[in-house]
Amino acid sequence: VIHATDGHAEWTASRQPQVVILGHFDGIHAGHVKVIERGLKYGREHGLPVALMTFHPHPKAVFGDERYARCLTPPKEKERVLAQLGIDRLYIIDFNLSFAQLQARKFADCLCNLGVKHAVVGFDNRFGHRGEGSAELLAEWGEGCFTVDIVSAHNDDDAKVSSTRIRQCLAEGEITKANQLLARPYLLRGTVIHGDARGRTIGFPTANVDPDEPYVIPRNGVYAVKVKVGGMWHDGVMNIGLKPTFKSGETRPSIEAHLFDFDADIYGEEVTIAVMDFLRAEQKFDGIAALVAQITADAEEARRRLASMEGAPALESVFQG
């Protein structure tokens, strides 16, 4: 991983003939994978290492849209997924107001100075000051230095697969659709912290998870999940929310997962949560008995839905690793 803090000076330190795949790639969804696979294929055929160049923080966050302070794949998560896909090198450009002033033609020159022989971009890729650079202009400016492969849109139900659509799905609890667009389950990683231990007193001990990075958090509600602890995956049910039965005035949602047939002490451990399906919205109950009855029903429904997903091809690569 190479971090460039001023936009381009550090790039030349790693100058060598290479393929570079360009884009933000938040989520690394099915459309992104199509672009990445084109770059990997070219690299294999021509004996060249394949790099991916991305930006952090999200450009929209830099320009004031706080929704984009959270990512579908924050930096470490993105690094993990790209390594699994076979990317040899990752350039993370520190996107700031200074870099945003970089002229598009200058950016193309930087790629040439980096030793790029072939660039792969999505059809709608924009770069440079005010997004003045396009895939077509990159191909024109790269003549004599590098070739450019422009990858067409990847559609699902006649609409382009996009990070924006996935964010919207997560905000609405449309987890099945989000996972379909991602071509894998949506993942959250975090550390198990001490909570109020109320779950254990009512027969449903939970792991309170503090996310390790600024992930986009799905809407408040109850979910069927798989949780990876110490290299093993466990089925479970998760609640994201404000726990209105017990608290009022809370504004920061908590993430609590109850793992089925599991009773180990995992405080302080890092866990990975694969969000598999949305069960219901969060609700306030009149008392403990009503809450316990609903959690029992949620657990049964989560078991049923998770059992129906066993062996699904899109899930196998995640749960075998």
Where are these regions (language model features)?
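N-terminal catalytic cores of NTP/NDP-binding nucleotidyl/phosphoryl-transfer enzymes
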Residues: E10-P74
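Residues at the starts of beta-strands that form the adenosine-phosphate
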Residues: G47-A51, D88-R89, K117, T147
